[in-house]
């Protein structure tokens, strides 16, 4: 029988601030670890930040810092948020610790020695300007499905999973130049060769019965579809070096090194780390993850351990939750939607209230939508009107009518006969990591305590039957003590406060549940929680709905910045649409060596000779459209005055030698990192409200300029008017 619980929460990636949904795993593991320790089981709770890989390298480029400095910054942010939530890690480390490289490389060398590593030649995008192979998320272009700007792994607009080669007009995210496909060698773990041993381990009844249904279904489906060799190396700089000749400029894929971080983080801080990680006979490895991490913990990490042929502690109990979502919206810092860890701290709502609500709605079997109104209702009814009310009414009654001293009580067997079986059920739910169910069973006991108090009407019987009333209140006091123990994994600060009410006269141990001695007096009492008010909840809902930011976002200059992409192009050739002679087909040079064309109704305004060879400005991210069967990939911009006079903006009026492909930006956006806007329709462009004023193009008084030369965009022929 296994005697030790090794508890892990999925290592959070350290390139962002965790939102409420991200906190589910660390909170879940925290509750289980606290329960385990209260039960007298030797327990170690491990977590830490996952710091290597593409996302970190990319974010460091965006923030103009080094990957390590970025990790240092976000590690501190994560740690401070978890501390506020009162998450009691035994170890909270980092995958950049001093032991991580050695352990990862040793795993690789063992796998290679045992014949589980293969070498393959593949094609990958390479940026000639930056002299690097581009990871999937380093490539941007148009999604082939919806034409929005997308990264090479997935389109955020339509959610389509992509390969970089699927993108239309792919570009390097760093320099915006077009990459080329280049051959490169990578190492793969031979999962098909490990499959039989992996399946034998999975089918072991002691393992599979301790997994959630979603984990079993997903893992079995993955195995049924057939395991494939999986790349374990990447052409990056930020990662663990590959100890193999010819691979000096490559690192291990983050999914390969990250789960090994559980081990290295332990070794970095625990001397007897092998008694935890090389002790599969006695150690019960309990892992808490989200459903997006299931296969890494049920297939990949176990395969690495099995393939090493060493006695590593391997996954036994897996708690894989579904998603916690937000008000039917997407968590997004930039959009101001959803509440993130640092936001929670500023709400004025105590951490135990947040913990309670997350556990109460823990997405164990289905996704859950966080709703502000539901938060208020659940907290006010279950946490306050039920649990907190029982504590307050019983202790207040004792102090008011019988004083601070608790007399030795007569055990009311009928009372406890209802309660004790429920304790056993709750402890079993904890053991099975069914935390939401455990909490709701505890609240049922609290509700029963309130009912017993109400039904016995002690305020009426205190004078006529003082001894019976004292015994009733004393039994309820011991029930409150037990509830504080059972609630300790969920709301630790509140449980400690109740313990202080009784002069710290007991320990948080499951062994004393149901005992009726040890409490001598009530030292003090106070209200545990204040009710959440509707006005406060309404304000918080508005604050984190994105609506408060909408007015600012709808300002024309912000719309332009985020939605409109203007570029300089040169007119190389002009044709007429054979079916509509008034339509000019302009063949353009946009600096990318790609054939681009737009269709515009210019008959009566210009001749071909007047425009050929000129540089104009187009809306480059307009959704493609067809005019009389001819595709148009943008729209030229022109100025129009109040008399309906119409003139195209000619860039030669602003600068002597225009450069095709140069972007038009707001003057106050100089030297800033600019986003690549998605495809838009004409209405979005119109809302930018570009005008010609005193011969210069402006938005809300801000000049439009050429990005590199900084020259202002001029409207020579129509000094005042609208731009259309």
Swiss-Prot record:
The keyword Kinase does not apply. CDD domains: Anticodon_Ia_Met, MetRS_core, tRNA_bindingDomain. A motif ('HIGH' region) lies at residues 12-22. ATP binds at residue 333. Its EC number is 6.1.1.10. Zn(2+) binds at residues 143, 146, 155, 158. Residues 560-665 form the tRNA-binding domain. InterPro entries: aa-tRNA-synth_I_CS, Anticodon_Met, Met-tRNA-synth_bsu_C, Met-tRNA_ligase_1, Met-tRNA_synth, Methionyl/Leucyl_tRNA_Synth, MetRS_core, MetRS_Zn. GO terms for cellular component: aminoacyl-tRNA synthetase multienzyme complex; cytosol. One of its GO terms (biological process) is methionyl-tRNA aminoacylation. A motif ('KMSKS' region) lies at residues 330-334. It catalyses: tRNA(Met) + L-methionine + ATP = L-methionyl-tRNA(Met) + AMP + diphosphate. GO terms for molecular function: ATP binding; metal ion binding; methionine-tRNA ligase activity; tRNA binding. The keyword S-adenosyl-L-methionine does not apply. It is found in: Cytoplasm. Belongs to the class-I aminoacyl-tRNA synthetase family. MetG type 1 subfamily. This is Methionine--tRNA ligase. It comes from Borrelia garinii subsp. bavariensis (strain ATCC BAA-2496 / DSM 23469 / PBi) (Borreliella bavariensis).
